[in-house]
């Protein structure tokens, strides 16, 4: 079984390992032997990777697994782990051995990377970026025939805030002040409460902001972070890299991945009894990998819990635009805290946003920010110092973050086309989510909670005992065994639930809803045929 190599989760994993006798797979371990039913090309692939691993192990180079930072060995990131590595090799082999496989393409359902799967960027955003990057176009008469008037106006305004009017220049370490002003205004419009641009730190996506906060809060294994299980593995990985302890709390699958305050209290008390100083609570809303959207009442309970226990609330809100059901609505934790009357001196709150998700999906542009509230001035100086070490985030990402929080408004030249693009993407995501949800729930032994938000489904698979035993023989987790077999048979890439964490003895996988609509029927057909064949092969 893949384990969370975090001290506080270790006991849970050891319990599960005693039940199932699995070892944690490693990307440096030799690949498992191909299944008897594997095509010859797959056999060649596994053979070549095993030989490569063996030659690596005899290297006399000065850097070895024994000499590198052990914290690096402790962290894992399943979203781009072993199965994805296999898929990438298969994709290369398909170019020259297309007839050797039972599929003609690899379909990546493993990661929230919309544009890699055919989603088009928002035209207004790209027009503004193009004009900012090639500012001389603004002086050309032809530009007014090629670009919308509001994208031209926005580009002028943005360039006025950039040092030297050049996107290749460094900026302030927190990000360009004029762009932070725009983002603060967008937050204020969203929440109905004031936002201060000096609280905003622009980063290369949300991930560096998470790392920055872990670096700030964790000094040893005696410092812990309450993190959900299942969780986005950025959190377990960053906690490991920065030397802290992950304190897991389990989301309740039976109630649609609900967050129970009673479980938070139990895990907090248990950690404290072991001498761990729990510093913060991570909440992902909408959920990744689980796709739930928290009710506002639940959020109030969470805020009150953090206030009472003196915990920093780390609010991962990068999917705030991705809500697909009419009975749920996104509410920021800052809005909830302010609605309860908690101000700067009452609760420490860090909220994360990214240009990679939502309806924009600009993953490669690496834009995002964190809004840091409820910290003393001397601590804020230390946060700024950490930001300064990295000089600044990239300017294109900064511009996109400002555009995401201040898109075209009614009356703007681009407004109608922007709304058509936005609504089209979100409605299509909702349709794809429902189609995949229904398909998964139709499979034998599979249950999938409602897709309320984010970009993922996290179905539970009840595997036959013979399949679990076959996985044990290959020294891999049963859900990873299932996902490898799925990849080898169909070319569809999903991520085992063991990479996100799950209740011991349960098995899941994460599947994105991002392949375009014309690909969904093929995914459903491939998955349905594979699952039936798999269950028939291993039926008890």
UniProtKB/Swiss-Prot annotation:
UniProt-annotated stretches for the region Disordered: 11-40
Compartments, as annotated in UniProt: Mitochondrion
Major localization class: mitochondrion
The enzyme's E.C. designation: 2.6.1.2, 2.6.1.-
Tissues with expression: Expressed in shoots, essentially in leaves and flowers, mostly in vascular tissues. Also detected in stems and roots.
Cofactor: pyridoxal 5'-phosphate
Composition skew (Low complexity), residue ranges: 28-40
SUPFAM superfamilies tied to this protein: PLP-dependent transferases
Residues carrying N6-(pyridoxal phosphate)lysine: 357
Transit peptide, UniProt annotation: 1-46
Annotated GO biological process: biosynthetic process; L-alanine catabolic process; response to hypoxia
Induction of the gene: Rapidly induced upon low-oxygen stress in roots and shoots.
Reaction equation(s) it catalyzes: L-alanine + 2-oxoglutarate = pyruvate + L-glutamate
GO molecular function: L-alanine:2-oxoglutarate aminotransferase activity; pyridoxal phosphate binding
GO CC terms: mitochondrion
Pathway note: Photosynthesis; C4 acid pathway; Amino-acid degradation; L-alanine degradation via transaminase pathway; pyruvate from L-alanine: step 1/1
Posttranslational modification: The N-terminus is blocked.
Any Pfam family hit: Aminotran_1_2
PANTHER family linked: ALANINE AMINOTRANSFERASE (PTHR11751), ALANINE TRANSAMINASE (PTHR11751:SF29)
Assembly and oligomerization: Homodimer.
UniProt family annotation: Belongs to the class-I pyridoxal-phosphate-dependent aminotransferase family. Alanine aminotransferase subfamily.
Protein name: Alanine aminotransferase 2, mitochondrial
Organism: Arabidopsis thaliana
